[in-house]
Amino acid sequence: MKSCLLLFLIFSFLLSFSLAEQCGRQAGGALCPNGLCCSEFGWCGDTEAYCKQPGCQSQCGGTPPGPTGDLSGIISRSQFDDMLKHRNDNACPARGFYTYDAFINAAKSFPGFGTTGDTATRKKEIAAFFGQTSHETTGGWATAPDGPYSWGYCFKQEQNPSSNYCSPSAEWPCASGKSYYGRGPMQLSWNYNYGQCGRAIGSDLLNNPDLVSNDPVIAFKAAIWFWMTPQSPKPSCHAVIVGQWQPSDADRAAGRVPGYGVITNIINGGLECGRGQDARVADRIGFYQRYCNILGVNPGGNLDCYNQRSFASVNFFLDAAI
């Protein structure tokens, strides 16, 4: 009898570990394998209980996409080169770094990316991703050859950072001598983002942040991770562009409606949105429209965030209320 009780206790102990949450904020930002939805409680699946909005945290498309997540049918090598026409210019510090093969390889780790919805939706997501990341890495200027929107991906890391971007954190402690300034296509910043991203993609970015600016596949993975991962109260960029995000009454009251403009709000709304006409927002739109034209897809409406209150202001008021 005692031996049976002991076996039961051992089984229960092991079961508690096997049932640990699998994804989302409960698992350090991890994504579900094979494009499965991450439920609001941190579990992976493909039914409505996992994928319904609001609640679903990432990859909320329902039925998982194909097993490879290969985007070569959505964006060709020649289109990639045309979009990022001057990335290898001698004036660009990132010349030779960002390659088509690195992008395609990295995207395979995120099966929902660029594979959700119909062909037009998939192309819009790729155009939106490169539109936003091109602004973050642009080397263009108003009179640049081929126009300012042909100079995305000119940089791979922040120039002359004024901070080491280290925020005190027990969960994501900064490594000695390391700085967490902007790196890669999305200019990933701060130790807590490096920590969560590293856990999700299987690389120790807390101790090796330079991997994001030294390894092009990891650079793209870090950018796509940011794109696919919601950070409450913000939805993921992915959920917005594929039409999975449904704004709440509070979102609508703040002017946040589905469209490319909300993605700008997610990425840098605290500095760029709700200020009327803004050159930075216009720059993001210019890249996106050019890429939509190359990929042959309509960019849709609601492209700016000029009159949107930022998600950051939502955080502020919630904190003040608490």
From Swiss-Prot:
Induction: In roots by wounding and ethephon.
GO molecular function per UniProt: chitin binding; endochitinase activity
PROSITE patterns cross-referenced by the UniProt entry: CHIT_BIND_I_1 (PS00026), CHIT_BIND_I_2 (PS50941), CHITINASE_19_1 (PS00773), CHITINASE_19_2 (PS00774)
Reactions performed catalytically: Random endo-hydrolysis of N-acetyl-beta-D-glucosaminide (1->4)-beta-linkages in chitin and chitodextrins
Keywords: Carbohydrate metabolism, Chitin degradation, Chitin-binding, Disulfide bond, Glycosidase, Hydrolase, Polysaccharide degradation, Signal
Segments passing through the bilayer: none
Database matches in InterPro entries: Chitin-bd_1, Chitin-binding_1_CS, Endochitinase-like_sf, Glyco_hydro_19, Glyco_hydro_19_cat, Lysozyme-like_dom_sf
Tissue-wise expression: High expression in roots, moderate in floral tissues and low in stems and leaves.
Enzymatic class: hydrolase
Residue ranges of domain Chitin-binding type-1 in the record: 21-62
Protein's name according to its UniProt entry: Endochitinase CH25
Organism: Brassica napus (Rape)
Organismal lineage: Eukaryota, Viridiplantae, Streptophyta, Embryophyta, Tracheophyta
